[in-house]
């Protein structure tokens, strides 16, 4: 079983990190389009063009499934991708539906492209949460992640300044609508009230992958990983610091 995971950069490693724990015997290919990151500030047409090129590259590797581990790419291009390729393509979207039972309001943080896209507004409408959902674009956070700047005072100030625009006493759930944002769960946790939960779309996406594979998640004894970047070949030593941080962040909710 060969599964490709695609993101504009290192955000999708949060999905790969969890997939390595949930699957066995899978040959994973992680493709990062670092050359064109970030996607979140680009036009929809540009994102579609980039995604079509990347998915074409991955289909040439004879993969059995492609996972778009990028909310921005899913929002802008998933329809075009599925109509252009026969390989199963799993998208990723903000876990807004988990806010149905939230006692207070919901704050969704994502890239500008995801926030302004029809897919998110349609999703919020579908679960009837328009009246209690607030949206906040955090474009700088993707750049911080790509530069491995996770714990600086500049990051914390940026998040405090942006999130303080809302009455946090009313927010019962923060939805991370960008996989890059998973690297900053500790900073979000430090800013938000203890009662405010933090969720992302990783587990929901992996559950969808397993459903698409007929409920099967074990295909052999060991997983393998091949890292590919549009700028250079990635090696494990470059990836390990990200995965170690994600192991810590996954415990924060």
UniProtKB/Swiss-Prot annotation:
Organism, as annotated: Campylobacter fetus subsp. fetus (strain 82-40)
Cell cycle listed as a keyword: no
Residues in the signal sequence: none
Pfam families: Asp_Glu_race (PF01177)
Task performed by this protein: Provides the (R)-glutamate required for cell wall biosynthesis.
Annotated metabolic or biological route of this protein: Cell wall biogenesis; peptidoglycan biosynthesis
Catalytic residues (UniProt): 70 (proton donor/acceptor), 178 (proton donor/acceptor)
Catalytic activity, as annotated: L-glutamate = D-glutamate
Gene Ontology process terms (BP): cell wall organization; peptidoglycan biosynthetic process; regulation of cell shape
Protein family: Belongs to the aspartate/glutamate racemases family.
Protein name listed in UniProt: Glutamate racemase
EC number: 5.1.1.3
Binding site for substrate: 7-8, 39-40, 71-72, 179-180
Cell wall biogenesis/degradation keyword on record: yes
UniProt keyword list: Cell shape, Cell wall biogenesis/degradation, Isomerase, Peptidoglycan synthesis
Single annotated GO MF: glutamate racemase activity
Enzyme's top EC category: isomerase
Listed InterPro entries: Asp/Glu/hydantoin_racemase, Asp/Glu_race, Asp/Glu_racemase_AS_1, Glu_race
